């Protein structure tokens, strides 16, 4: 396997660099006087100075010795500045979009996929181009500490006609979303102008436009504004300038080429070609250097890696005694053994409220019958909900609505009998997806049923009219879980320690996308899980405002430990391990608060770890030996160059990446590149000294990676393994849904 990571070769452990004491005034003065030849950056109370192009005799500041890896932040800043200045020297016609992550557009005509179809007077003014991104990382793979560059490729619109030009062409700008472009002082022709999404144009007078922003109406020069680079906005302009037919043709080319440009095999080839151009000249490595003796080269071939550990697919358990197990697919276990909690599940005869539009009652009742009793000729759903999940009698109470309006649905819900239903199944039209969150009946119906403590299973009219064994099988699984059942659990990893796993997710609620928009982050604290994946303390599921999440977490944690210690018979002196799956890096002050809480629960020895799980990172894994797999009825291979599920690399003692979707898990060849998730154990940052805390932290990355991998098999929304563990999947869903309701 190979990473999109190109190692940097530094042949010294220490280096010398000039420094001065930091002040804002002095830093500004130095940049003003010497910015053409020197780089200046701050670290703490010190200004660090790199002489790239001035004479060696020009000295500024006093010389200081630094360790290449012990002072990694300083080394990293020096590498970034030298890379930037060398790039500008070698490619003077390229203006980078950003300093860091370093981004620039390809200058090759072949990388603009709409160039040949555009009219001549729009060529190079409008484009859909390859955007190249370079980021720096310090890794310690297999004990080898080194820096390296990560290369990624995206495709972005270019539209460099100002609103002044569009206005002169009589293009209607009223109501159009616009960006304000500002060239930062001293960076003309060095960096592209900074663009900020400010709002919509409401009025134009002469050379100025009034823009509705989050600060109210503000006035801008038309020459400083550009339309927001979205498919919708650019499509509208192309229709105006050419024709609807031509605009549709241009946009269709982009859509048709999407599978090709994101093909993993081609992506790998493009990344390696970019590395050769950036890091070599006619096959010879480029020497990135300054006049002070700091220098490095970069490998033009990506780093080859092997799996750090073997991640194992868990065994699925279907009875409390762990005598009924299966090692392949949990669906096979359910068909053979029934659900894990069959002997103790107390809702054996669920009453289910079913609501549909009167025009689809025939198909809806057929759907319910097939859901309950199964499809006799099918492979996966012969038994149906009732027999597969060992239920005695599933009773449906079907009610009709005249129209698909909120009032009609709420009326049907209010009419349910005194015998409160255990669950509701509600048919809704596909058109609900086009509603805004605020007016969407889906969220309002869900909120009403939530207030009545009735779980709900929505099904779209399309599925009701055209359901298969696959959709019925998944819906039955979801229904059993929503009734409170446990379809299967995982084996606990043998340990004398007690363990709880807590998921904390989040979602952003923004008024709009304009700069300065009012936004709220909603945090969802999911049900606590035991190490075998059983959900504990269901009443603790909630969402809270971001500023209150840590206080709520501590309260839930304290109550949960008290409750579970009694329920599970913990003894004084037991070691209890708390694994938090959390959406954000934790602050040092939050480590302090947790450690204080732990000291307050003195009867147990508590160890804990905060772990972030994310797919928003720049790292990719390639397997050049993977030639792809074909699906039944489709000869086009999918997943070329994508590693198998469970492939993994430990980037350092705290960070690893794990491939969750391999070639076999992809649905089609159109999926494109599948990124691994990044798992990172969070530790206090900076000059932090708390010896007591160090003894409380749990550092076993191998254990945590295996547990997270196993928990991806615990999403009861589907029988297929998920990309993220159930802890994060459900906590993110909770915060998203409750935030919208």
Task: Give residue spans per PLM region.
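Extended, highly charged clamp/arch subdomains and adjacent linkers
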Residues: 4-23, 27-30, 176-457, 461, ...
